[in-house]
Amino acid sequence: MAAAQGLLFWLLLLGPPCRVPGQPEQDPGRRFSQFKLCADEECCMLMYRGEALEDFTGPDCRFVNFKKGDTVYVYYKLAGGSPEVWAGSVGHTFGYFPKDLIQVVHEYTQEELQVPTDETDFVCFDGGRDDFDNYNVEDLLGFLELYDSATEDSEKVKEKTAQRVEEPPEASNESDAEPEPGEPNSEESESVLSENTAELRERSEAQKSHPQVNSQTGHAQGERTSFESFGEMLQDKLKVPDSENNKTSNSSQVSHEQEKIDAYKLLKTEMTLDLKTKFGSTADALVSDDETTRLVTSLEDDFVEDLDPEYYTVGKEEEENKEDFDELPLLTFTDGEDTKSPGHSGIEKHPTEKEQNSNKEHKVEETQPPGIKKGDKEIPKHREDTVFSDVMEGEENTDTDLESSDSKEEDDPLVMDSRLGKPRPEDHTDPEKAADHLVNVEVPKADSDDDPEVGAGLHMKDKGRKVEEPRRDWVQHEVGLEDETQEDQAVQGSSQSGHLRSSPAAEKSTETLKSAFANQENDLKGAAVHISKEMLHEEKPSGRSLEGASKSDSVPQAKAAGNQGEEGKTEREPVGVAAPSGDHQPNASKDSVDEVDGSISGPKPHVLSGEHPSAELIKDRLLKLQNQTRFSSPDDMGLPGDLEKKRPILERKLSWQQGGVAAAVNKQVSEKRELPEEEVTRVTKDASDEGQEVRKTGQTDSIEGRGFRPKEPNPEDEDYSPEELLEDENAVSAKQSKERSPEIQDKRLDVDLQNPEKPVSGAIKTDPETEKNKEETRHVSENERKNETAGKAVDSLGRDAGGPVVEKEGSSPVHQKVQRPSEGSDVPGKKQNQTPELGEASQKKDPDYLKEDNHEGHPKTSGLMEKPGVEPSKEDDEHAEKFVDPGSRGSASEDPDDDPFPWAPHAPVQPEESVHLEDLPIISSFFKDQQSLQRFQKYFDIHKLEAMFQDMSSKLKSAQRESLPYNVEKVLDKVFRAWESHILTEAENMLDARVTENRDLETKDSSVFEEAAVLDDVQDLIYFVRYKHSTVEETAPPAAAQPVEGGWDGPAEDTQPPLEENFPQEHMEVPLMQIPKEPGHLAQPVTRDMGTSGVAQKPQTEEDGDPGIITPQGTPVDADDAQKQLAANTEEPASVTPLENAIAFIYSLVFHLTKTLLATLPDDVQPGPDFYGLPWKPVLITASLGIVSFAVFFWRTVLAVKSRVYQVTEQQISEKLKNIMKENAELVQKLSSYEQKIKESKKHVQETKKQNMILSDEAIKFKDKIKSLEETNEILGDTAKSLRAMLESEREQNAKNQDLISENKKSIEKLKDVISVNASEFSEVQIALNEAKLSEEKVKSECHRVQEENARLKKKKEQLQQEIKDWSKSHAELSEQIRSFEKSQKDLEVALTHKDDNINALTNCITQLNRLDCESESEDQNKGGSESDELANGEVGGDRSEKVKNQIKQMMDVSRTQTAISVVEEDLKLLQCKLRASMSTKCNLEDQIKKLEEDRSSLQSAKTVLEDECKTLRQKVEILNELYQQKEMALQKKLSQEEYERQEREQRLSAADEKAVLAAEEVKTYKRRIEEMEDELQKTERSFKNQIATHEKKAHDNWLKARAAERAIAEEKREAANLRHKLLELTQKMAMMQEEPVIVKPMPGRPNTQNPPRRGPLSQNGSFGPSPVSGGECSPPLTADPPARPLSATLNRREMPRSEFGSVDGPLPRPRWASEASGKPSASDPESGAAPTVNSSSRSSSPSKVMDEGKVSMAAKGPPPFPGTPLMSSPVGGPLLPPIRYGPPPQLCGPFGPRPLPPPFGPGMRPPLGLREYAPGVPPGKRDLPLDPREFLPPGHAPFRPLGSLGPREYFFPGTRLPPPNHGPQDYPPSSAARDLPPSGSRDEPPPASQGASQDCSPALKQSP
């Protein structure tokens, strides 16, 4: 940070002064610089890897564009120039950029080579364009203009900003919001940037003390603006958004200047900016395509938290700068957004560079989520055009809302803030934002007057989620803007937001903010970074942000190194102050609760930051969780439906998608809000008020228990409970912003907890008031519905309920928020309601849980299932916790809906929710990850792609329906390929447009990898659509209809989404009521709100999920869950049987209904989480099983008993017996005749089969012959063609050769002349050459001799030199020895002399001393005797002493002299050492001289050698020249030879021509022969076909006769059996009557009451085999009316008597299927006109022939006599039978009557097939199931076949696509050996057919179309 700041600071400091002198220097020709510094000479090696500190957009294509956090690779640097420019690459783009805009992360090399530049270095690297007029870097980067106009513009900007701030909301919203910010900003930004550059220098110190972030921000932005902004300023002037962005940067720069004025202001402003970043929506965000504008947060976003004392104090200072700061808040976006908010972004840029880098992803999400960036900026990215227009529409609507809100403002003092017009910019930004604006509008006028931020705070309260992020943004803005207004607003805002919290909480937060703010100044950077990060995180997982918010409040702040904590505190505290109003009071309706919760959420954050609020928050959350666990799911699911809708919206807004999504939402809202947004707002307010009342009643308990709720929610407050759900939205956005700031997450957690409690309490109806509130909410919702048409009435209700609450709780903002969500969710909100609820439900529940609980999820959401749903809510919480951190889990569990919803759906759903995930069922169901969805949305127009995907889906559906079953896949593949290319083309175009757009916007949003990933996503989506259709509709044909209806949203969802769309507001209002007890009730007004969204979606998810169909509802549900569910659904067909699907569906439906019913029960009657300690599930299952078993038992025992009253008299019986006897006799005769006929017909059939086999074999042989002849013919034709081509080429070659020959002849003649000339020259040359050779030999001999002599001399020289060296060495050694000996000798002599002298002196001294001693003794003796001086010897004593003294002196002198001598000797030694050194150096020099002389001599010798070599080389050159001439002559000879060879080749070619002509003639003859052969073959083929046809006709006739005989026999058998039975009965009765003569009164109709004759064998599945001509279905010979089947068709096999052959006559008869029962032809029913062509072909000829040939077709014989009619009788052109099918056809009837459609069978879950359903010899599973419904049986009905021979029909199955066995063209029972085999015991396996039959099957199958 410091380095980056320093770079920016010095760049700004030094840039301007250097500009003037530098400009002329920077234009050395067409170059930026004369030299460049590289790591190597080619400048191709990397020097540095850096990270972008800011966004940069170059003035032209020579510069590379990048965004903050992008990785930049530096290859070289330009030398000189005031703005140092480097060249590098970002992704695949290469260009120049200012050095100071990147931070070096890694240095690859330290070496720098200065290389001159080339003009080609300064052209466009993309296209090479070099037509540039300006090569002055300073001019291009706009330094001069920025610098010159900085002061004036900055002042203007300040003034304009002040004016804008001061302007009323309308003016500011309308005029300033968009155009004004843009114009002044573009100009002002330049001036401000320049001023800031100068001021930044001054402020650099203050910035250091303050968050250097400001200085950095100023510098970064100033620099950035200086670089980028200046280039952009022109664009900004054109682009209001850009100008707004510039204005933002300008205002931020102004804020930097104000930083000089007050660092606190800047810090607060930056904090506000940070808060803004976190704030999902920007009330005042100006709508524009500019990225910066997107990032701008509206002033309204400033929270009442600004009211905090700290803000209040700072507010005064900021009041001075408030204009600028207001400008900043309005236009600035938070760091998360791109850190374009100059001041704040600067802080965040550097401190939050990490954030932005890490949050860059978030930045896209976060920065845009703030709503402004997203609203404005992201809109350009994703839907800049449409969304912008939509946003403008939303603005208009918002304006309408604002006007209505303004009127409301008159009613509500809070409205003034919204009037400040700041809400309108936000309104422009987002309808939801507009709703927020409306909410802000509802903010008290005093607040709005004092500070639009207060309104923003309230507005943020309404936004809830938005508030959480913007709260920080607002806090920042508030810090800046509200420093003035914060005093008033802090009072009002704190009073308003603190109504619930109580002023003390606000004060605490204010104090905390002060302290934190003071800390934040220093910590702001980190805090801002952390906050923005937290905001990102918070926005992403709002659930996390809840818990994480609490954690982040305490922990993230701590993480912020205390800076963030402080900043978080300040933000929280402002947020806390505003947070109650803004963060958790985003549900302004919650304001009381939120303020209570705000104290929880806002104050808690304050407490967390200042106190240990995290613990309190956790406790509160736990309480909330407990309450919510009971009710959170309902609450979340009910109110959260809206809240979640809003949450997703908010989260989306929070996410970068928020802008675009919000814009889309605005669009949808504006479109859908036909009513003025006032009415919608009022309706939503009313709904939210009532919903809040409901919640608040519940929340009052939980909140009051927490002690956070100072005020108990009024009924109006309860009305706002839906807005509390908005808090859930806030939780969602908190989750998003949780990533941005855990602090906000804490607040959101509190909010979410509050929301869950409120919705929970409302849903639980814990209090009678809550229930009443629910009813009120329902009434409100109904009223709102009415108000949708007459919103004013509801508006009055909303104001009544919400107005007071708004004043107290800031619920009016909540209302607006509710309105915003409701408005946004009128259409989007509703969809979002479903989506959020589904998301919650799905997130709460696992995919399985979704199935069950999604049905229940909405009831839970509505709170109907609350109590039983306590566990579900817990599960939801757990599920949410899974998505959220352990910390976030608390919040997630508290707000499981919020958590889970924001979590998974948050990713896909949130982006989509503003877009309406329901509007994007396909895309939303595909994306699990919000980031991927956001990324997807960033590059593409999602709505357009969704439309294309839906078109593709519809095309696939129609193709699937229209195409024949066997051809479905091919048709689908064609459609798929066509749409794939179309969609990919469109997607690439969108991507290119988006990339260019991003470049224009200076936003390098995408890397190449990201673009590639997005395109991969598009392709995956295409495959997803294709796969969905193939799996859904094929695997589950019965359910496929539902999926088609349901579409992507599921069958229920299609119908329900409209309801949800119609009632999103009501949905918000009456979450509890919204949950319909039954999906059918979704249409009810109450259910419309929650029920439609919640219940409808749950049933939808259930229905969709159960059938295994992918339900787009999964998208509304957690994205993860949705995708899991989707995957599970797609996989279900394979793994789940239809029965299981049906059971699951019924189970989920029952579970849902029970939940809805239980939810409606009074609270005291609702069941608990368990049943006396046992889980409900097993208890219910056992109870249901008991009931079912009892019912079955009762039915089997009691109801089965039938009264058997015999109504037949003896006479009747006797008559019947007689008749029966007669009939029996007749039948016996008939049977015998039929048996004979059958035998005869079997013989005929066998004969015909044999004949057919013979004929088919012959036909095959002929075919083989024909094929071989055709092949030979083709080969000959090819050879003939090749020969012709060769002939033509040879002819052409011959012509060319002739020309060459003529030319060659001419050249030969010329060459001959030349040769003659050359020959003479050559002779001369040879002579000269010979002479040269002789001279060369002489020279060589001389050279050898000289060389030998030279070698001998060298050897001698070397020997002599070696001898010299040896002698010199020995001489030196000896001389050294002599010297050493002499020295030692001298030393010894000197030492001896010294010693002698010393000895002499010492002896003298000793003798003298002895004398002295003697004399002293004598003197002592003589003292007494004589005093005379004379001694004995006559000497005087005095003289003696003198002598002694003299001697002593002498001795002293001797010692002195000796010391002097020693000194001299030492000097002498030193001199000797020097002498030795000089001697050694001399020797060394002499040695060197010798070496040099030797080197010189060697070089001279080498020189002579080289000269000799040079001479020899010159001679060689001469010789080579001569050789070259000789070779030329040889080549000329070769040329002549080649000419002769050419002539020979030409002759050969002429001969080849003749041969080719002959070959052509032969080819013609062959062709004639081939044609003749073909004619003969055709004739023979026709004759054979005719024979085959006649045989087949005969065979079919025989088969018909046999079947008729069989049928007659079977009927007779039945009748005989019946008669036997009757006989037995009669005999018994007769015996009884004889024994007991009892008169039985005859009862009329007795015969009819008896069992009808059993005619089972005549059923379709009877014993009749397939027609010999048809390889397929066996059916009775119903001529043209298939339904006219025998009565026995409905009998089971058990009811059929055995045939005389010893086997049951046929398999279990199938019920008439849909085709027969409904009268509609089934796809495979031949009788219905769908006779399969494959069937036809197989029946028209022998299987082998038909299948192999596929060409033989027989003429139709009119309507087929039976369903399995032979091909010959069916029209040849009839529709083909469907191909392989893995699922049964839709069954409409069962054996006992109509039955429900069975669930789809998985690919491996086909129902068991009857014997007839398999081709002979083909085991089950090897062939496709027939489509004919008659060929499918429900599982479990497999008949048992007794052992024995098969009936004639039982050997053949409806294998219409399979060939008959090898027996012959007529498919008849296989050989007797095969017939002897017992039939399979089940229908799953056909009886084994003969081997021939099985062998024929495989080729037939292969060849069947």
UniProtKB/Swiss-Prot annotation:
Region (SEC16A-interacting region (SIR)): 1785-1845
Location of Phosphoserine modifications: S226, S229, S873, S1428, S1663, S1675, S1703, S1724, S1738, S1742, S1890, S1904
Top-rank taxon: Eukaryota
One matching Pfam family: SH3_2
Annotated glycan sites: N173, N246, N627
SMART domains, sorted: SH3
Region annotated Disordered, chain positions: 154-259, 313-621, 657-908, 1036-1059, 1085-1118, 1416-1443, 1639-1905
Residue stretches spanning the membrane: 1174-1194
One Gene Ontology cellular component annotation held by this UniProt entry: membrane
Coiled coil ranges: 467-527, 1211-1393, 1484-1636
Sequence segments annotated as region (Proline-rich domain (PRD)): 1748-1905
Signal peptide extent: 1-22
Lumenal topological intervals: 23-1141, 1163-1173
Domain SH3 residues, every copy: 45-107
Acidic residues biased stretches: 173-190, 317-327, 392-414, 715-730
Intramembrane stretches: 1142-1162
Compositionally biased region (Polar residues): 209-220, 246-255, 488-500, 1647-1664, 1891-1905
GO molecular function, one term: cargo receptor activity
Comment field on protein domains: The proline-rich domain (PRD) contains repeated PPP motifs. A single PPP motif is necessary and sufficient to mediate interaction with the COPII coat subunits SEC23A and SEC23B. Although 2 transmembrane domains are predicted, it only contains one transmembrane domain. The other predicted transmembrane region is probably a hairpin-type region embedded into the membrane, which does not cross the membrane. It is unclear which of the 2 predicted transmembrane regions is the transmembrane or the hairpin-type region.
Subunit composition and interactions: Interacts with MIA2. Interacts (via SH3 domain) with COL7A1. Interacts with the COPII coat subunits SEC23A, SEC23B and maybe SEC24C. May interact with APOB and MIA2. Interacts with SEC16A.
Family assignment from sequence similarity: Belongs to the MIA/OTOR family. Tango1 subfamily.
UniProt name for this protein: Transport and Golgi organization protein 1 homolog
Organism the protein comes from: Bos taurus
